[in-house]
Amino acid sequence: MPGKAANRFAPIVAALQWDRGRWIWLLIILLLLGGVLGLGDSISALFRYDRSAIAAGGWWRLLTAHIVHLDAHHLILNELGLVLVWALFAQDYPAEEWCAIVFSGALAISSGLWWLSPHVSWYVGASGVLHTVMAAGTANHLATRAWDRWILLLGLCAKLAWEQWGGHPTPLVVVDAHLYGAGCGFAVGGALSWRTAIIRRRSA
């Protein structure tokens, strides 16, 4: 019995183990996000998703919108979210695949806002990309049959549904960005997990 209990909680212990390289990268990202906020409102105005500015040629905003924040409170909330998803999912994909997931998520969110949410005139923040990361991690947990896979899937889907049906308390949160980010995360994460499974079968 003790052995079975230890095996049951092994994934939790593994997820929270100190991996110096991964956590150093997390610290660097947190500091960079804070540094961007410290550059002031002029940088935020230059980097944010701004529909009229993008139409005038400011295409870089499609990517940079996801690294600027409204204020310190907004930044701290997103950084806490980043720490949580890092602890849960950092080991699910190699670094190059995570870069592809994040890049794809940023583009998918901005494209979704442009084509599907024309009422959104501006947007800033990393929360949409965090939903990409959560969905990609959940896709991997589903593919690997991790013990928490259904908890993660139901929790994320319930959150997205709650937001889409008017559950979020503040209109400043662009919930469409969360939906587009999660959709991209499930698609890209699912594709990567499927590819990895095929490679493992062929090499077995």
Model-derived features: positions:
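Extracytosolic (periplasmic/ER-lumenal) interhelical loops and adjacent juxtamembrane/interface segments
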Residues: 44-71
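C-terminal transmembrane module of polytopic alpha-helical membrane proteins
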Residues: 1-20, 67, 163-204
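N-terminal signal-anchor transmembrane alpha helix
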Residues: 13-47
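Small-polar-interrupted transmembrane alpha-helices in polytopic inner-membrane proteins
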Residues: 25-38, 82-136, 151-162
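Di-metal (Zn2+ and/or Mg2+/Mn2+) metal-binding site signature of metallo-dependent hydrolases
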Residues: 65-87
